[in-house]
Every structure is written in structure tokens, then in C-alpha cells.
Swiss-Prot record:
Subcellular compartments: Cytoplasm
Organism: Saccharomyces cerevisiae (strain ATCC 204508 / S288c) (Baker's yeast)
Molecular function, one GO term: protein-macromolecule adaptor activity
Protein name: NAP1-binding protein 2
SUPFAM superfamilies attached to this UniProt entry: SH3-domain
UniProt modified residues of type Phosphoserine: 102, 196, 235
Lineage, top ranks: Eukaryota, Fungi, Dikarya, Ascomycota, Saccharomycotina
Record flagged with keyword Heme: no
Chief subcellular location: cytoplasm
Amino acid sequence: MATMETTTQKDTNILKSGLKKTIGVLNEAVLQNGREVEAVQAGNSDTMEDTETTTIGYISIKDYAYADSNPLHYGYFDGDNEEDEMVSDSSNGEDTYNKRQSITLPDDYIVNQRAVALYDFEPENDNELRLAEGDIVFISYKHGQGWLVAENESGSKTGLVPEEFVSYIQPEDGENEVENKARPFYLTHLITQSVSPKNNIDNTNEDEYDDNDEWEDIDDVAEVEADMKTKLDISD
């Protein structure tokens, strides 16, 4: 009986010591969690303070001179960092200016010469120009990779044509071709009017009138001479 009581007492003591250890571990865990929560809260408060500090004095602006897709459309104004903002704006302006500058082509890319189509060409894309054999086109410059930027003879359309499909016209050939071109309609009309029968009749009448005036002048001179001889009574 005494042995059983001793064993029960030992078990009780073991349970008590185990509970104390468990409670101690739980208390430490609770304290540790409390410290972590305080640290997180402190960090959040610092972040919020920094955010409030960084957003104070900033005014969001929009520049409607630029499209919505352009980065220059949106911006902000900071009273404390106005100089930095001006420097940033100037750099952005320079970048934009450089992007807007015209691209200068190398001299060997510029053609500015007329050409004649050697073969028919059917365009496969909207930026290509249709050619028929014998068409005259004006080549502005080389587009690259065997393509030329051409304009049709009427000047109504511009597009790309294959370089091997055309042959350049030399200046002297171009001059001869210009001379052999048909006259404009208004020149033909003027020439036709100038040689019409009505004009010929009018010109003939005017010529006859001028001839009569000349003969009348000669007769008048003869009469004056005869009158002078009579009055002077010149004798041999």
C-alpha cells in the first residue's frame, strides 16, 4: 500500500513538472509573438509616415499637348524639388526632340531620278506600287534590301518597287522623251485657232487694206509733183 502511494506521488510530481515546462514554453511563445507583432506595427507606422512625407507637396498634372500614350502626358509638381523636376523635364524634352528630328539619309541612298519599268509588278502589300512594263516612275531614294521608293508619273501614288524591275533613265534620254510628248490640249487649241480660215480671211483683208493705203500715198505724191511743176512753170 505504501509503495502504491509513493508511485502515485511520483507520477503526480512528474505531471506537475511537465505542465510547468509546457506552460513556460507557451508563455515564451506568447511573448515572442507579442514582440514580433509590435515590430511589425512599428514598421508599418514608419512606412506610413514615410509615405505621408513623400506625398506631401506633390501635385499630379497632365499635359494635353501630348497623347495619353506619351509619357510626357502625365507628370507631377513638387515644390521642394522644383529644380530637380526642371532638370528632369529638360532631359525628357531633349529626348523627345531627338526622337522628332528628321532622319538624314546617306548620299548613296538618295536617287531623285526617273526610271522605266522593265517588267510588270503586282503589289502584295499596301505600301507597294503597281508597275506595268514601260511605265515611267520617279525614284526618290533607296528603301533598302532591294526596294526603291517610287512615285507614279501622275504623282498620285507613292510606294515601294523592286530595284531589279526598273531601269534608270539618263538625263539626255529624259529630255528627248519630253520633246516627243504630245502637246497639252490648250496649246493645240491655240494653234488650231491661229490657222483657221476665218483668221486667214481677216488677215487677207487687212493686207489688202494696207496695200491700198500704200498705193494711195504714191498717187498723192505724184499729184503734188505735177501741181508744183505747173505752178513753177519750169521750162527747159
